[in-house]
Amino acid sequence: MKLSKDFKEIKGDASFRKFYRNKKKNSIIVFANKEKPKNLLIYDSINKILIKNNLIAPKLLSQNYENNYIEIQDLGNKTIYQIFLKNKKNQYFIFKKIINVLNKIQLIKDKKIKNFKNIFYKIEDYKNKILFDEAKLFSYWYIPKKLNKKKIRIFNVKFSIEIKQLLSKLNFKNDTFVHRDFHVSNLVVNSKNQIGLIDNQDALIGNKAYDLASLIDDVRFKTSNSLKVKVYNYYLKTNKKINADKFKNDFEILSVLRNLKIIGIFMRLAVRDKKTKYLKLIPYAWKMIDNRLAKNKDLNSLKLLLASNFPKFINK
């Protein structure tokens, strides 16, 4: 792909995409020759839905789908993750602003929109099968590197049973817009000091607790348990109609499943894609899993399975 000298490559994420910033035009080229529909067509569709609902997301400036790229508005390079690294004083205040954005996201009713090819895109439901398959990334990629062959077979059978049981215990319906990667690295502060959303292509209609679990138990950014509790309580305070007990149950189950998935993804990145930098984040993912397992009796059986195989990370 040939670009003018005005475009500078941006350090990429864990996906197959490449990004190029043009500061003169205030734009970014998103290039994707793998998983093209998701990374270009669906990405733009989700952005359109967010913008339609008065949220800040990158607008499409131009598209060249045949040559594997789109040009989008540049929201800037100041992520909340970067702000937090520089200043730890106002984190709770900023988290409250993030929760206000999340509340706005969760009011979205649109499920369908026309993409730039003039074809309707409909957001899919976050079905239990998807959650199950995501959790199985842990057993598919991480387990073979950590257990012997005999243990692998036994673990995988038991693990599948545990995950299915946990999914059957979720209370909330799939009726809420879920970003799926709602964390401080994907939240950008623009020139007007407003919070914008990036990396939006994975959105589904799912459980209300998922994005909050993604934000609070974020593997890339360590927060104290006391801050986690404060942010969680602020969400409940701004959503008084929610059944707190049922919500807590779903939050804890989804947090554990998400971080098991993430461990699997990080091992896959290392083994398949030779991207080893994410391996150092795995111990913190384990720490958050252990923290949530200790708080929900419905997770006891999974806790025992993990503790018997990974006593270094999970307390019995």
Where are each of the predicted segments found?
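Active-site activation/catalytic loop segments of kinase-like enzymes and analogous catalytic loops
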Residues: K136-K146, K208-I242, V256-D273, A285-R292
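ATP-binding pocket architecture of kinase catalytic cores
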Residues: Y20-D133, N171-F172
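Acidic, serine/threonine- and proline-rich low-complexity regulatory regions
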Residues: I242-E252
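Active-site acidic catalytic loop and adjacent metal/ATP-binding pocket
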Residues: F16-K23, I105-Q106, K164-L212, V219-T223
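A short beta-turn/loop motif at secondary-structure boundaries
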Residues: I10-A14, S62-Y65, L254-S255
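An alpha-helical support segment within catalytic cores of ATP-dependent transferases
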Residues: M1, D110, K117-N118, K122, ...
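ATP-binding glycine-rich phosphate-binding loop
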Residues: K2-R21
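ATP/Mg2+ or Mg2+-diphosphate-binding catalytic cores
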Residues: G264-K316
